[in-house]
Amino acid sequence: MKILSWNCRGLGNQTAVDVLSHLVREKAPNVLFLMETKQSMAEMRRIQADLPYHCMVAVPSVCRRGGLALLWMVDVDLHVQIYSPNHMDALITKDNSFWRLTSFYGWPEEQRKHKSWQLLKHLHSRSSYPWLCCGDFNEILCMEEKQGQIPRPLRPMQDFKEALLFCGLADLGFHGNIFTWDNGRLGEDLVQKRLDRVCANMEWRDMFPHDKVSHLQVSYSDHFNINNRTTQSKKEKEVVKAL
């Protein structure tokens, strides 16, 4: 299964929609998570009509701010359990095994970042299923994940680390450029950060030990998209079924 997560920074012009369509054709994700769509429900329905996804749950933007959409192929057994302007929590069934997918968008405002970690901890309390959590967390874990301008204070990074530890989530790493966002400036004014990532608990990592995460650059948006590919061997499927 392929899962693609992208902070598209708005789908209000044809260029953005064309880039998205090309991305879907090229990478063929089974599940697509979009953040900051800046679209109404009706607008997202029109975009969906041009994509190969029969299923969608969307949170409309408010005054052209925010907006989420989770789209999936008809052959994916996915059921969204709860959602908000900052997340979508779904249960996926495959080969008689169950696992949980949380698509996450952290608060970008500095004074509200604590709400991201409160939400993450609340989601942790809802289920003990194998758990994959991906998206734009709007925070870094260490100074190596930022380049340019002044260093990030330690406290916000520590809060993020503590939230992941509390939830039993571990970063799955990546292939490609370490940074997933930049401010589009040049020279000394350029700032780059790793804001987007994929995390999972031990149960999920045991279920999908050959998972691969890639950072993919696109011509539109200041964010890379995150492509996550999950595979299970026949032996691993049998173990999961037996549990």
Model-derived features: where do they sit?
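A shared catalytic/ligand-binding motif for oxyanion handling
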Residues: 1-243
